[in-house]
Amino acid sequence: MSANVAAFPVPQPSIKITIAQGCLRYLDSKTPTLNHLNMTMPAGQWTCVLGRSGCGKTSLLRYLAGLLDQQIEWSGELKIEPANRALKDQIAYMAQQDLLMPWLSVLDNVLLSSKFGARGDFVAYDQKVQALTLLEKVGLADHANRLPQQLSGGMRQRVALARTLMQNKPVVLMDEPFSALDAVTRYRLQDLACTLLQDKTVVLITHDPQEAIRLAHHIYIMQGNPSTAAFLTTLESSTPRTFDAEGAQLQQRIMACLEHDDG
C-alpha cells in the first residue's frame, strides 16, 4: 500500500522553547551536570547540540520531554510560546535505543502511539496508510509484518524514526537517531527527516559535526564542568546542505571547541 506525504495530518503550530539559567543536578552529587544553561530553540527550526560523552546532552532532552527521574533536581526557567499546553504533551522523543516492542510487528510499532487513543485494537485506516507510507520512505515497506528481532540494528533504528515521525507532534527531540546507519542510509534518512519535520521545532543531539552542519539552523556546543551551552552559529541556508568549503571551516570551528573543552 502506498500514499504520499501530503496525506499526513496538518501540522500543529510550531513552538519556541527558551531555557534561562537552567541547572541539573543528581541528588547524590554536589556538582551539577548542567549549570547556567541558557538556550533558545526557535519555532519551526532545527537546533543541534554537540558535546563530549557524558556532558548532559541526553539529560537535557529528557528534561524537555518530562522524563527526569526523582534522583535528578532541575532548577531554572522554561518558557514555551505559545503556552497553551504543557511541553511534554507536544513532544515526540526518539532515544538512542530504538525501544521497539519485541512482540509487536514493525507496522504495529510504528502505530503504537495511535493505539493509545484507540478503542480496543482499532486503528483508523488512514493511520495505517500513514504508517505504511513512512515505512516505505525509510525503506522498510517489505518488512511491515516482521518482528524487531528479525531486523538489523540499522533497520530497527529506521523503524524508531518512522514511529517518531508518525506521532506528528510540533516538537521532536532526537538523540543521535542516525548514528547506527551506514553513510548512504544516513544521508537518505536525513533528507527524509528534513522533509517530514519541516516547520517543526527539532532538537537534535549528535556527535557528528557534519550532521549538525547539514541539518541545523542553530548549533550549540556543550562545554565545561559543569556543562553549559555555548551558542556557536546560526545557519541561514536551506537544509539538508551539501558539505562545501564553508562547511569544512565550520567543522574545524566545532572540532576546536570540542578539543579544547576542559570539562
Tell where the protein language model's regions lie, with residue ranges.
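Helix-to-loop junction immediately C-terminal to a conserved catalytic motif
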Residues: 65
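Short coil-to-helix segment of the ABC ATPase nucleotide-binding domain corresponding to the Q-loop/switch region
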Residues: 104-113
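Conserved ABC ATPase "signature" region
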Residues: 122-143
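Conserved ABC ATPase signature
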Residues: 147-151, 155
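Hydrophobic anchor residue at the start of the ABC signature
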Residues: 161
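A short, proline-enriched helix->beta-strand linker immediately N-terminal to the Walker B motif
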Residues: 166-170
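Helical segment within the ABC ATPase nucleotide-binding domain
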Residues: 186-198
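Conserved beta-strand-loop-alpha-helix hinge in the C-terminal portion
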Residues: 224-255
